[in-house]
From Swiss-Prot:
Alphabetical keyword list: Endoplasmic reticulum, ER-Golgi transport, Golgi apparatus, Membrane, Protein transport, Signal, Transmembrane, Transmembrane helix, Transport
Gene coding for it: ERV25
Listed name of the protein: Endoplasmic reticulum vesicle protein 25
Signal peptide: 1-23
Domain GOLD positions: 34-124
BP terms from Gene Ontology: protein transport; vesicle-mediated transport
One Pfam match: EMP24_GP25L
């Protein structure tokens, strides 16, 4: 039993490293350019974005947050974020999405330290689920809950690999189609030049004959 448990721990640790999870801490200066963090997500995937912003309302700074993907879908736009802000959504497309922050100065008072410290956590797929709640609701043992989690992470990895394989095939087909078009364009251009050369020869011969030069 102990070797199986140890093996399970190794597998879980590996999948935890390769799973789609990211954490980031940074300072955002008031009036500076917006700061964005980008992640890719598959369609119909659960995403939880947790942002923790220090400071307090009325301190002369307003931190706004918005989440949108590359195809134009918007998933949230919390305003004047202070403390913890959590946004939960399900993606509408296979696309990258941006989590962007802006720090807008408010009021006329002079700020001694015009920065807000931000902590950002983005959980995607199986990592976005509350496994403690699932374990309690379904009355699962800790090992069973961990196996469920590992199974879902593995399924997500397989789905992502299939998506990448399909995209690679699509790009390969596009490349082959482009090569064929270039080939036929080259052949058509060559025959056009040959025809133009033949026409010039015939035209010059007719011209010289009309002038009795040949």
């Amino acid at each position: 039993m102990a070797p199986q448990k140890s093996l399970l721990q190794y597998i879980c640790s590996f999948l935890l490293l390769v799973s789609s999870v990211s954490a980031l801490k940074f300072d955002l200066i008031a009036g500076s350019k917006e700061r964005c963090v980008r992640n890719f997500v598959g369609k119909d995937t659960l995403v939880v974005v947790t942002a923790t912003v220090d400071g307090y309302k009325g301190d002369g700074m307003v931190v706004n947050l918005y989440i949108r993907d590359a195809v134009g879908n918007e998933y949230g736009r919390p305003r004047d974020v202070v403390g913890e802000s959590r946004t939960v959504f399900t993606s509408h497309a296979d696309a990258a999405f941006d989590v962007c922050f802006e720090n807008v100065p408010s009021g006329s008072q002079r700020l001694n330290s015009p920065t807000r410290h931000i902590e950002l956590d983005i959980d995607i797929g199986a990592d976005a689920k509350d496994w403690s709640a699932i374990q309690a609701t379904e009355k699962l043992k800790p090992v069973e809950a961990e196996l469920r989690r590992v199974e879902e992470i593995t399924s997500e990895l397989v789905t992502e690999m299939e998506y990448l394989r399909a995209r690679e095939q699509k790009l390969r087909d596009t490349n082959e189609s482009t090569n064929n078009r270039v080939k036929w364009f080259g052949i058509a251009t060559t025959w056009l030049l040959v025809g133009l050369w033949a026409w010039q020869i015939m035209y010059l011969r007719a011209y010289f004959r009309s002038k009795h030069l040949i």
